[in-house]
């Protein structure tokens, strides 16, 4: 069994890998010509950065000794400042990753610490499924509604702006609640299932079985994704494969993360 300190080091390694993938994916939007296709392997690798961050966020919430949901407000505020200062756009509208992480901390802080792994996992998968059902229902809009902070031109009416917020928050913003909140709940479920919370789940045999389960899950989910795969277009120059985040992609991303965790803790 690994100590808590070792697990944190391993999470730091996963975070470092995710940061590298994120930098690669985000820089591609400015390095490559906007209307030219990006290399597929780069698109594939960059697509695993965001789910890794979300899953790790859930694991950190499950590891926290005292839930602090209000920290999510500060992260959302930073997201708003980034929108205004960097992108010069109206905040709390397109819902980039910082908004989603902040909101999930608020929603998940207490459940991640006190719910069982089973309850967290079932809720997480339900959130993933809701995202897919909304996409199947034709509610996902590929084009984002954004408002530039250009004071030379009048802003759209408040009614028009407010009408787009719920849809982009829950369905088709950069990182909508459905399905991305599900990743955080599943990350918390993974953490709740570790030996720190489940002393009976220890030993080399358990680690070996978890490794095989992770491999089988990866094969099944990636096979399903391959059978249902349609290469998505780039979205405003960003080339990750989760626009929209279909169920096959979500399950594959979780499987890759689970396999990495199993390898680290094996």
Q: Language model features by range: what are they?
A:
Residues 1-266:
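Alpha-helical transmembrane segments and their immediate juxtamembrane cytosolic regions
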